[in-house]
Amino acid sequence: MDLPAPIHDILLVSLGSGLIVGGLGVVLLTNPIYSAFSSGLVLVCISLFYIPSNSYFVAAAQLLIYVGAINVLILFAVMFMNGSEYYNSFHFWTIGDGFTSVVCTSIFFSLIATIPNTSWYGIIWTTRSNQIIEQDLTSNVQQIGIHLSTDFYLPFELISIILLVSLVGAIAMARRE
């Protein structure tokens, strides 16, 4: 990423400060769930450090593996702990729940409207003299990204939603016992 020097410096300072704040949150917060979310902030900031050095695949892999898998497992383990002392003042529906449900519902309906109307094959195919040809100069990493963002995009997202629903269901069942 060829950024001007001041923007590059601001980006690095903001990522570093996010890393420090997240690390302090992991250590200083008494609620283990908040501490796990702070570790997620730390992992996101670490993965974003790779972007200014043009290591996009490493950044994406770090986000998928550490934030998407490891941090979810940490949150899953924290949810199994006996957290009754943290939830003494349980409210059934709060303002934050309403705001979150409105945001999630609007994102869901915008995705439902956008996905069928998007030409996914138009992302990678180029047109030259009325022939549609695939770009020949792609590496294996680019081919993986191309196939994940075109051919396997919808199955990839459906699997992630199924895994998320099963995780939430397992947490809900473990909470009842």
From Swiss-Prot:
Q: Which UniProt keywords apply?
A: Chloroplast, Membrane, NAD, NADP, Plastid, Plastoquinone, Quinone, Thylakoid, Translocase, Transmembrane, Transmembrane helix, Transport
SUBUNIT field: NDH is composed of at least 16 different subunits, 5 of which are encoded in the nucleus.
Give the InterPro entries listed for this entry. NAD(P)H-Q_Oxidoreduct_6 (IPR050290), NADH_UbQ/plastoQ_OxRdtase_su6 (IPR001457), Nuo/plastoQ_OxRdtase_6_NuoJ (IPR042106)
Q: Which protein, by its recorded name, is this?
A: NAD(P)H-quinone oxidoreductase subunit 6, chloroplastic
Quote the EC number: 7.1.1.-
Q: Belongs to which family?
A: Belongs to the complex I subunit 6 family.
A molecular function (GO) held by this record is: NADH dehydrogenase (ubiquinone) activity
Write down the Gene3D superfamilies for this protein, in alphabetical order: NADH-ubiquinone/plastoquinone oxidoreductase chain 6, subunit NuoJ (1.20.120.1200)
Catalysed reaction(s) here are: a plastoquinone + NADH + (n+1) H(+)(in) = a plastoquinol + NAD(+) + n H(+)(out); a plastoquinone + NADPH + (n+1) H(+)(in) = a plastoquinol + NADP(+) + n H(+)(out)
The answer to whether UniProt assigns keyword Plastid to this entry is yes
Q: Which residues cross the membrane?
A: 10-30, 32-52, 61-81, 92-112, 152-172
| Record's function text | NDH shuttles electrons from NAD(P)H:plastoquinone, via FMN and iron-sulfur (Fe-S) centers, to quinones in the photosynthetic chain and possibly in a chloroplast respiratory chain. The immediate electron acceptor for the enzyme in this species is believed to be plastoquinone. Couples the redox reaction to proton translocation, and thus conserves the redox energy in a proton gradient.
Q: Which GO terms of the cellular component aspect does the record hold?
A: chloroplast thylakoid membrane
Q: What class of enzyme is it?
A: translocase
This protein's membrane topology, according to the annotation, is: Multi-pass membrane protein
Q: Quote the subcellular location field of this record.
A: Plastid, Chloroplast thylakoid membrane
